[in-house]
UniProtKB/Swiss-Prot annotation:
Coiled coil: none annotated. PANTHER family: DEPHOSPHO-COA KINASE, UPF0200 PROTEIN MJ1399. The keyword DNA-binding does not apply. Keywords: ATP-binding, Nucleotide-binding. InterPro entries: NTP_hydrolase-rel, P-loop_NTPase. ATP binds at residues 7-14. It comes from Pyrococcus abyssi (strain GE5 / Orsay). This is UPF0200 protein PYRAB09750. GO terms for molecular function: ATP binding. Belongs to the UPF0200 family. The keyword Phosphoprotein does not apply.
């Protein structure tokens, strides 16, 4: 089974990925695939460089490009593991591509939803170099994500976690949903 993890920036995808890793379930990051591709092409891993690589691979391979890039790694992992998680799916075309590339695998989409204000605060605190510095930058980034089609992926998810309360409640919700996904799909 392949679990496609999606959510707006700062929604809590990283925490969900950590929970899967703790259970020994491998997690492949779509963002890492772009960073690796940038390195291969000798392009700096700055926000501008990564955006360029992201657009370039989509131009070369189509809208499901990142799914194509990580497919070999996924195929390898699925030889040893019943379940693999893909973190950072952003468009319906990527979901489509995974279904095409892995026709014999059960594919489930898990979305994390969190209100904009909470996501903005979280992103400010984590301090990644590509995180927005102002509310306007944050709204701009959200607009770009929504233009990719992430809203549609979230809306059509098989499972949803709403991260709008305490961190403890979020962690409990993660555990519950992971158990539900693994139980119902390994019967």
């Amino acid at each position: 089974m392949i679990i496609l993890l999606t959510g707006m920036p700062g929604s809590g995808k990283g925490e969900v990925a950590k929970a899967f890793k703790k259970l020994g379930i491998p997690v492949v990051s779509m963002g890492d695939a772009i960073r690796e591709e940038a390195e291969k092409r000798g392009i700096p891993k700055t926000p501008e460089g990564l955006k360029y690589v992201s657009l370039k691979v989509r131009e070369e391979l189509g809208p499901g490009a990142v799914a194509i890039l990580i497919a070999p790694k996924l195929k390898n992992l699925l030889k040893k593991h019943k379940t693999v998680v893909v973190e950072g799916v952003r468009s319906p075309k990527e979901v489509e591509e995974f279904r095409k590339l892995f026709p014999n695998e059960e594919i489930k989409v898990l979305a994390i939803h969190s209100p904009p204000g909470a996501r903005y605060e979280r992103m400010r605190k984590r301090g990644r170099s590509d995180d927005p510095k102002t509310w306007e930058e944050f709204l701009d980034r959200d607009k770009k994500e929504l233009n990719f089609g992430i809203g549609e992926v979230i809306a059509l998810a098989d499972y949803m976690i709403v991260n709008d309360d305490s961190f403890q409640k979020f962690k409990r919700d993660i555990e519950v949903i992971i158990r539900k996904i693994l139980y119902f799909n390994h019967q």
